[in-house]
């Protein structure tokens, strides 16, 4: 099983690398340079900022609307559904069509993460390998689910350079428990994927973390306060996205026009705030290493939340994992700036709260505090952030859980089940 897990890790890593390269080529075609979406948006005139996300949304919607029309619905559509409640069979053709749609959305500036389709493609590799093995040997449903889970762990690792968090993500969120029977193959798959990805992109932190130290015991209380704020903000963010989905559904527009409308909203916001384009890696690194006025951070946060709700609510294929990190960083920076103004001695480095805020809001939305702690640690490669991160993540999780609001993945599973019940039989070509 471990050897098969390593093979899945290799295949999953190569699939995510191929997706990255396709995305890079699309962005190069759009801007003539590989400079990132935010830099591209800043260089465009206002009318192009409005037009590009709209056209990208329309193309993404057409890809979904007509690409899925003739595909028989065999297997689960989402990797979490295939692992948690399915038989481990993931529809390869649906995954490819949805990934193509995601390419159009992400490359044109939609406020969603590229990591969602990357994980889906890697999980698809695990499902395909399991189906091939079935012809040579008996493979139980439990083993099929584990193979898909190995692919998902490889995909998360490839997307975030976080092999430990990738394995824990699947255990904590999908399986609901960490056991030695599942953790071993997941770690092998994640480590294999990490080795391959680093051969292409090198070894380095996703977010370069500035140095900071605790200066007093009082600072612990300020991080607990940040966790409390993130725990209240998480359910509000997810609720806003759900309301946006409902609003788009009530328009009764065809799928292509809904995605185009979502792109139009993102484009309109980007005329004033181009930082809403894409997943926001460059903006978060800017939060950490450049001075920002709190008014500017607040404006960027509000517009980013609106852009994410518009993109995800319209039905664009992509994750909200990375936009959540963006919103957490902005929330943490605002909180740290306020604490520094009120208690300079207890909050000497406001940007440290940006990193901790990412983990706290992630824990509040995923209900997975251990994964959130490990994810931020591996993305920053900074041990000094772990202690305040643990405090804020646990506080954020407990606060969000106390509200009774479901996690982002529980909402997604429930939504997928409802959609499956409403779907008519597929058309024949």
Swiss-Prot record:
- Main localization is membrane
An annotated GO cellular component of this protein is: plasma membrane
Cystine residue pairs = none
Which controlled-vocabulary keywords does the entry list?
A: Cell inner membrane, Cell membrane, Chloride, Chloride channel, Ion channel, Ion transport, Membrane, Plasmid, Transmembrane, Transmembrane helix, Transport, Voltage-gated channel
Q: Where in the cell is it found?
A: Cell inner membrane
Does Glycosyltransferase appear among the keywords?
no
Q: Where are its TM segments located? A: 1-21, 44-64, 146-166, 168-188, 200-220, 221-241, 259-279, 283-303, 315-335, 354-376, 383-405
Q: Does the keyword Acyltransferase apply?
A: no
Entry similarity comment? Belongs to the chloride channel (TC 2.A.49) family. ClcB subfamily.
Q: What is the protein name given in its UniProt record?
A: Putative chloride channel protein ClcB-like
């Amino acid at each position: 099983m471990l050897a098969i897990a390593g093979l899945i890790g290799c295949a999953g890593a190569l699939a995510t690398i191929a997706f990255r390269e396709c995305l890079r080529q699309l962005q190069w075609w759009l801007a003539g340079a590989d400079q990132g979406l935010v830099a591209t948006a800043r260089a465009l005139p206002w009318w192009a900022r409005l037009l590009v996300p709209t056209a990208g949304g329309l193309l993404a919607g057409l890809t979904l609307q007509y690409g899925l029309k003739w595909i028989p619905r065999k297997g689960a559509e989402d990797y979490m559904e295939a692992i948690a409640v399915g038989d481990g069979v993931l529809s390869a053709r649906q995954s490819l069509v949805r990934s193509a749609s995601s390419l159009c959305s992400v490359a044109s500036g939609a406020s969603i993460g590229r990591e969602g389709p990357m994980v889906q493609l890697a999980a698809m590799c695990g499902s395909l390998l399991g189906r091939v093995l079935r012809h040579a040997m008996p493979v139980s449903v439990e083993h099929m689910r584990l193979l898909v889970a190995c692919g998902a762990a490889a995909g998360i690792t490839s997307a975030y350079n976080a092999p430990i968090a990738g394995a824990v993500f699947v255990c904590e969120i999908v399986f609901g428990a960490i056991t030695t029977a599942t953790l071993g193959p997941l770690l092998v798959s994640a480590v294999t994927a990490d080795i391959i990805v680093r051969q292409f992109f090198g070894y380095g932190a996703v977010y370069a973390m500035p140095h900071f130290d605790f200066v007093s015991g009082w600072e612990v209380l300020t991080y607990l306060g940040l966790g409390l704020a993130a725990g209240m903000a998480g359910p509000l963010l997810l609720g806003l996205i759900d309301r946006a989905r409902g609003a788009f559904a009530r328009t009764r527009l065809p799928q292509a026009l809904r995605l185009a409308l979502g792109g139009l909203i993102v484009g309109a916001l980007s005329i004033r705030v181009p930082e809403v384009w894409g997943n926001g890696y460059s903006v978060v690194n800017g939060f950490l290493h450049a001075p920002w006025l709190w008014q500017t951070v607040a404006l960027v946060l509000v517009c980013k939340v609106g852009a994410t709700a518009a993109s995800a609510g319209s039905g664009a294929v992509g994750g909200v994992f990375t936009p959540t990190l963006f919103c957490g960083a902005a929330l943490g920076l605002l909180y740290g700036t306020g604490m520094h103004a009120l208690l300079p001695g207890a909050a000497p480095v406001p940007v440290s709260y940006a990193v901790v805020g990412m983990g706290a809001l992630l824990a509040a939305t995923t209900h997975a505090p251990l994964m959130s702690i490990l994810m931020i640690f591996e993305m920053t490669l900074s041990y000094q952030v772990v202690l305040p991160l643990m405090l804020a993540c646990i506080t954020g999780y407990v606060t969000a859980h106390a509200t009774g609001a479901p996690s982002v993945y529980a909402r997604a599973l429930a939504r997928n089940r409802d959609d499956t019940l409403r779907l008519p039989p597929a058309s024949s070509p």
